Design a protein with these regions (language model features):
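Short coil turns linking two alpha-helices in DNA-binding domains
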Residues: 62, 67-69
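A generic local structural motif
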Residues: 25, 75-76
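Amphipathic alpha-helical dimerization/coiled-coil segments
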Residues: 1-22, 40-45, 94-122
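Alpha-helical residues within the helix-turn-helix
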Residues: 57, 74-75
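N-terminal helix-turn-helix DNA-binding core of bacterial DNA-binding proteins
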Residues: 17, 21-62, 84, 88-96
Length: 122
């Protein structure tokens, strides 16, 4: 298991576990153009998120299609949904976004040792 530290504030950290299977599922969800557009729109919206109707208007996506794509993003943990009165709000789970980015970049530029390199060194 891979562990990524997420900074909540200057003095608070906690660990989110991330593995290749989880990361692949999240990247697969973002690999669809409509879901990527939804996600980027929600990132722009910030912590308050957007109501589903506003997402639909902004992206000109049919309601049933939008519902399907939002459900996929929520299933993989990238988007949170909640009800406020009669409206459903969607927002990005920024801790999970940071965990995914951390997973992708954790070992950046640390070098790679291939089997042949190890044998040559021996």
């Amino acid at each position: 298991n891979f562990r990524n530290t997420v900074v909540l504030s200057e003095n608070t950290h906690y660990i989110i576990s991330m593995n290749e299977e989880t990361a692949a599922g999240r990247l697969e969800a973002l690999g669809h153009q409509t879901r990527l557009s939804i996600y980027r729109l929600l990132v722009k919206a910030g912590d308050d998120g957007l109501i589903v109707g506003d997402i639909q208007k902004a992206l000109d996506v049919p309601a049933s299609t939008l519902s399907h794509h939002l459900a996929k993003l929520a299933r993989v943990g990238l988007v949170s949904q909640g009800r406020r009165g009669r409206e459903i709000y969607c927002s990005v789970d920024y801790d999970e976004m940071r965990a995914l980015i951390g997973f992708l970049t954790e070992e950046c530029c640390t070098g790679v040792t291939l089997e042949q390199d190890a044998q040559d060194a021996a």
